[in-house]
UniProtKB/Swiss-Prot annotation:
Disulphide bridges: C61-C102
Keywords: Disulfide bond, Glycoprotein, GPI-anchor, Lipoprotein, Membrane, Signal
Protein name from the UniProt record: Ephrin-A1
Molecular function, one GO term: ephrin receptor binding
Region forming the signal peptide: 1-28
Subunit structure: Binds to the receptor tyrosine kinases EPHA2, EPHA4, EPHA5, EPHA6 and EPHA7. Also binds with low affinity to EPHA1.
Lipid attachment in record (GPI-anchor amidated serine): S195
Organism field: Xenopus laevis (African clawed frog)
Positions annotated as glycosylated: N36
Family the UniProt entry places it in: Belongs to the ephrin family.
Ephrin RBD domain segment(s): 29-161
Stretches the record annotates as Disordered: 162-181
GO biological process, one term: regulation of peptidyl-tyrosine phosphorylation
Top-rank lineage group of the source organism: Eukaryota
Amino acid sequence: MMELYRAAVQLIVGVGLGVGLWLREAQGERHIVFWNSSNYRFMQEDYTVQVQLNDYLDIVCPYYEEGSVAGHTVERYTLFLVDYEEYETCKPKSKDQVRWECNKPFAPHGPEKFCEKFQKFTPFTLGTEFREGRTYYYISKPIHYHGETCMRLRVHVSGRTTPPPVNVHTPRSHIQSDEPEVPLPGVMKSVAGNSAAPGTPCTLYGLLLAALLLRL
């Protein structure tokens, strides 16, 4: 009886780990970056986020409540996906490298958000395909004024056994975010939920346990 019980426990644990890994690979984690000058991480010279294939990068644009600030003071940005050389100089070569435009700081539905999925294959002809072990580079240019201020981000796609590069931002929470602990004035926080399907492992555990108990 004890041997059967131990086997049942091992089976449940093994299946649970397998289901968790499958959900992790299928759903991916979300990494949130607040793209505004108040984000202190952009003050680092090598601000880097580590992701894995099937993860998501959520870019949250600057947002202000209507009437909270003067229109000429709000931040607007054009974001580019560029090569390393352009990342270093912060000068994109072509308008074809434009990835997104954060140009609706007073959007009625809340802050604009853009999503990048780091997938190996894409069904779109002009889509970007990402590879493990490589680093991808994002930079922005301000729309709200003509200046040389540059905000830039490195995203490293690591494999299962690939060690992260130096100075990589890897928070412990499942929802990876650079949201500051102290609320910023005039900036609305974004709300994100767990990307994994809720309750699936627990439900499977229960069914397996019930079936095994019926056999005892």
